[in-house]
Amino acid sequence: MHTITNETDVWAGNDWSLFSVRGGTLTIKNGTVKAKDNDCYACDVQYGGTLIIEDGTFVGNISAVYVHEGKAEIKGGTFSIVQTETEGDPYRFLLNCYDSNRQAGKASIVVTGGTFENFNPADNAAEGAGTNFVDEGYKAVKIAETPAPNGTFQVVKNAKVDNADELIGALADPEIANIEVASDIDLAAKSSEELTFEEHKTIDIKEGVTLQLGSANFLTAEKGLTLTGKGTLDNSAAASTAVVAAASDVHEHKSLIHVTGGDLLIDGVTLINDPEYHWHGSSYNTAAIAYWNDANVTIRNARVISGEFTLCGMGRNGANTATVTLIDSFFESTSSNLDNKQHWAYAMRLFGSEVLIENCEVKGIQGAVSIEENAKAEIRSGKFYTVNTSGQQDAFYALYVSSSAEVTITGGEFSAPNVRTGLQIEGTSAVVSGDNDTDGRAEV
């Protein structure tokens, strides 16, 4: 691929850009177009021309793409600017039209794809507050908080779904990256195979809306999942198999989300993984969220409740290299070793290379937080505690560190109701390090 750039200034008279489309149609499919710092735009359109950008990297000054008269169709690519505007939002003209021509219908920008640094193409101030360049059927999704101050936005194909079949179809369609769930959907009859998707998906569950799973199915993200909104993902209404399991040596797990690769971001959603179900399966642990390999996990502003694990790392002996970031969220497990005297769990079991917990509340009975498998963790703030089941003394530790994990505690409250004596490990009854395998370490 080629790079088009300039070492001397281009800007003069009507020469504004490295590519200037003055009538006719120009299609750019790849490569890099980088304007000299503090000089010109990357591309402009004049005299009724049409610019089609399918891919590539475009770096401009004030604007990456400017349309004076004509049309720009942006289907892909990455867009940024070096020189910024001096007043108002400094990045607001990254995409821009000549105002009077846009108002007269002579200048337009239509965005159906692409990645934009510090600029939301669906909501910006280029042509006044609330300017939207994104075409119908597409949506701008914030994919990163960096670079400052506005982060990075990506435009993806959007689908609004109202029933189970529409949702299954959207998960299977590789071109649909964003799915909006605006009404209750019952997925209990769908298989886990139908709920497995190979491309990264964003699922936005609107406030007051419930996405209902069954007793034996769950979402599987092979290349990541972003789950947003103020709605609920729930399987607790599904018929519990606890009675059947109690009479059998074969136990099934219940989960909401499995992530085997890519990044998992949960923001604002409530997850309820049957709080009355206390069995693990023969292949998988019961966990609201289970993650493998390098599936980095970020959970913020969320509520996660489960009958066993709320969050569970999978893959021992260094196989799990995830980073886990938990911020401003609530986690609760109702698991106790007295439930069935066979299966139990901490509120969360964290594997991976790095763990950060900040301003979270984690509540358990069997235990709150277990950090294992060589993880390097920092707990900055929050509340971590266990409670006894009514009439019992079954609560264990607020924090348990094992298997060579290292945890640094710089803030937070840790409490447990019972004094555990006879422990051949360091720590207190609330914060405990070490196990029967390899010692872990907690520093306060």
Protein language model annotation of sequence segments:
Residues M1, G23-T25, N30-T32, G48-T50, ...:
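Detector for repetitive beta-architecture
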